[in-house]
């Protein structure tokens, strides 16, 4: 079984000391979706609800989620984010509004939590933008698709339903 690095020998949570690690290029890509009912799907495809363009605001929310990760996740290190790329995709057959977030930096620790936080917050913002039309939406799963850097190097995690390849 893998060792849980965020616990001390007594089982108490600690922030890991990353100072001995080498600074390397870190990249993480995560994706997730919001499943919409018919009224929300119609509002999204028609350019939005009463609050404006949902995609644009969700993209901004995703960037904000990336930037605030260390405030939201207690043991996450604050990182000097160098780039955030947010892409959206509408799947009309399954009524899924997808977001993909890629984050990069030079650092001593992984950036996966930032990518996942970005996707999660972006999807919550999308829900917020459409809830005036309908509350019949389901926040779907979000998951890591790819990470680069650190001792494991490149890790890809394919997701069959996802519109993007890792």
Which positions does each model-derived feature cover?
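C-terminal binding/interaction regions
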Residues: 1-55, 60-166
């Amino acid at each position: 079984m893998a060792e849980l690095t965020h616990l001390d020998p007594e089982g108490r949570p600690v922030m890991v000391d990353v100072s001995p690690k080498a600074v390397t290029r870190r990249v993480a890509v995560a994706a997730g979706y919001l499943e919409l009912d018919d009224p929300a799907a119609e509002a999204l495809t028609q350019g939005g609800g009463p609050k404006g363009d949902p995609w644009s605001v969700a993209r901004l929310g995703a960037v904000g989620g990336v930037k605030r990760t260390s405030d939201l996740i207690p043991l996450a290190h604050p990182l000097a984010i160098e780039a955030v790329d947010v892409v959206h995709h509408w799947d009309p057959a399954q009524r899924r509004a997808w977001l993909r977030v890629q984050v990069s930096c030079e650092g001593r620790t992984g950036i996966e939590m930032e990518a996942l936080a970005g996707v999660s917050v972006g999807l919550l913002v999308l829900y917020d933008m459409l809830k005036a039309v309908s509350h019949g939406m389901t926040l779907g799963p979000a998951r890591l698709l790819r990470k680069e850097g650190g001792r494991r190097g490149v890790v890809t995690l394919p997701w069959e339903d996802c519109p993007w390849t890792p």
